[in-house]
A protein has these predicted regions:
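Class I SAM-binding transferase module
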Residues: 2-53, 57-305
Length: 305
């Protein structure tokens, strides 16, 4: 199964190519773009001040301008910022977009915003730090009562069978490696992987692992636990993770398997050892995600009896 970033194999400028590939894949995701356009059009009012966090190529900032924003503060800490500046000029938005170079938690804007928009929803929902920077923005960058796009973010987990993806972990223990790579194996076990799953990879129905209202959420870790029910015989290699999000009233988006044309992948939390499961088995799970999305811990156990 493929893992991002993908694309043609061959000599090229890796840094520029990765940036262009990544953002082009999002722009080609029509469901993603249409949903954000509808949400922004319904939320941004003429004359609003908007802050776009993780503005990337500037697409959401452009949508906000078209919705009537007086000024958009586009905050971006990556190299795509310079491309976004050029695109704003080429598309006639440069007079209404102020680009702010840096991470949103480390910069200021000259006036509080009426609307916060952002597309930093990760493959597993919370892996791009949306809780930490949203709380910071609410406290420092927004006026009281400001509106958010997205408003709400949920994460789902399900037992998954994925032989190919589990090799990302198990291959570090194979014979034939020139030295002792046990440390790499331990790190792989603690890694959230991004994979391409289908419903055929799932061994049971999903369970809600997180439901976060970004308008009110505290800057705290997500902690959750539950019980998964196995619907078919197979081998469980890990927990599959995906999200759904309420962007604005009546506008939602998700990356539930299968991906079809989605630019999002899925999250995969591997088990140390695969578990043979049968229909009717129950598995308890625990999960914790830091507000920054950098630290994930999880545990899965068979429920005996």
């Amino acid at each position: 199964m493929s893992h991002p970033p993908g694309g043609p194999v061959g000599p090229r400028d890796s840094s520029s190519a990765t940036v262009l590939d990544y953002h082009l894949s999002m722009l080609h995701d029509t469901a993603r773009m249409d949903a954000f356009r509808r949400a922004i059009s319904a939320t941004v009012q003429p004359g609003d001040v908007v802050v776009d966090i993780g503005s990337g190529s500037g697409i959401l900032s452009f949508m906000a301008c078209e919705a009537g924003a007086r000024m958009v503060y586009a905050i971006e800490g990556g190299p795509v910022m310079e491309l976004a500046r050029e695109l704003a000029i080429d598309n006639g938005f440069a007079d209404r977009i102020t680009f702010v170079d840096g991470w949103s938690t480390e910069v200021d804007i000259p006036e509080p915003a009426d609307v916060l928009i952002s597309e930093t929803i990760g493959n597993a929902g919370f892996d791009e730090g949306i809780i930490a920077w949203t709380v910071d923005a609410r406290e420092r960058l927004l006026r009281p009562g400001a509106l958010l796009v997205p408003q709400r973010l949920r994460m789902w987990v399900a037992p998954a069978e994925s032989f190919d993806d589990h090799t990302l972990v198990s291959d570090w223990r194979t014979t034939g490696l020139p030295y002792d790579y046990a440390a790499a194996h331990r790190r792989a076990l603690r890694t959230l992987w991004f994979v391409d799953l289908t419903p055929g990879n799932l061994l049971g129905q999903p369970e809600l692992a997180a439901d976060v209202d970004l308008r009110t959420a505290p800057n705290e870790a997500i902690t959750s636990a539950g019980t998964l029910h196995v619907d078919r015989d197979g081998t469980m290699h890990g927990l599959a993770c995906w999200f759904d999000s309420l962007l604005s009233d009546g506008v939602t988006i998700d990356n539930a398997p299968p991906r079809t044309e989605s630019s999002w992948f899925h999250g995969f939390l591997p088990l140390g050892e695969p578990i043979a499961v049968s229909v009717g088995d129950q598995l308890t799970w625990e999960l914790s995600v830091s507000p920054t999305g950098e630290h994930w811990t999880w545990q899965v156990d068979r429920l005996e009896g």
